[in-house]
From Swiss-Prot:
This is Adenylate kinase. Its EC number is 2.7.4.3. It catalyses: AMP + ATP = 2 ADP. Residues 128-134 are annotated as: LID. Belongs to the adenylate kinase family. ATP binds at residues 12-17, 129, 170. Residues 32-61 are annotated as: NMP. Pathway: Purine metabolism; AMP biosynthesis via salvage pathway; AMP from ADP: step 1/1. GO terms for cellular component: cytoplasm. It comes from Leuconostoc mesenteroides subsp. mesenteroides (strain ATCC 8293 / DSM 20343 / BCRC 11652 / CCM 1803 / JCM 6124 / NCDO 523 / NBRC 100496 / NCIMB 8023 / NCTC 12954 / NRRL B-1118 / 37Y).
Length: 187
């Protein structure tokens, strides 16, 4: 059975690293909304053109456009064996859209992996990246904004019965051991 996953967690929680392990071991397609946006912009698709208008104005791209881009990507053949969404959904409205879209296509979210890491460790990891724009103030703001966005999604998927909270503050191998345990027990 296809494994359809959502990765949640604050910046620095290790989602990308764990996603790489999952792709390697489970042959699941990793779908990043950033990649979807870049592809639509580069290919100058109709959705890309619409998104560009908002982005050029410094505005957030509306859910309808983001949802349409994700739906278009989920229609592609390579996701039949399973997919892993990273960076989507970003809010409860997008989560509701995704559930309906998947249901309409005979699919569902198999599991939502929420990587939980203490703020102090997240801050330390992000500062350790050495990016010029990663000042303590910027990092604290990014964590606060992302926490406000993540908590309703954690609650949404908890109520849906598909949330698996994983302690992302440990060694990579220990975190991945827990990820594998969840994935290997999905029906």
């Amino acid at each position: 059975m296809a494994k359809n996953l959502i990765l949640l967690g604050l910046p620095g929680a290790g989602k990308g690293t764990q996603a790489d392990f999952i792709v390697k071991d489970y042959s699941i397609v990793h779908i990043s909304t950033g990649d979807i946006f870049r592809a639509n912009l580069a290919e100058n698709t109709e959705l890309g053109q619409k998104a560009r208008q908002f982005m050029d104005a410094g505005d957030l791209v509306p859910d309808e456009i983001t949802n349409a881009m994700v739906a278009d990507r989920l229609n592609q053949q390579d996701v039949e064996t399973g997919f892993m969404l990273d960076g989507y959904p970003r809010n409860e409205a997008q989560a509701v859209f995704l559930d309906k879209y998947l249901s309409d296509n005979g699919k569902s979210v198999s599991a939502t992996l929420y990587f939980e890491v203490a703020d102090t460790l997240l801050r330390e990891r992000l500062l350790g990246r050495g990016r010029a724009d990663d000042t303590p103030e910027v990092i604290d703001n990014r964590l606060a904004v992302n926490k406000a966005a993540n908590l309703p999604l954690v609650d949404y998927y908890q109520k849906a019965g598909v949330l698996h909270t994983i302690d992302g503050g440990r060694e990579l191998a220990d975190v991945y051991h827990d990820v594998k345990e969840v994935l290997d027990n999905l029906n």
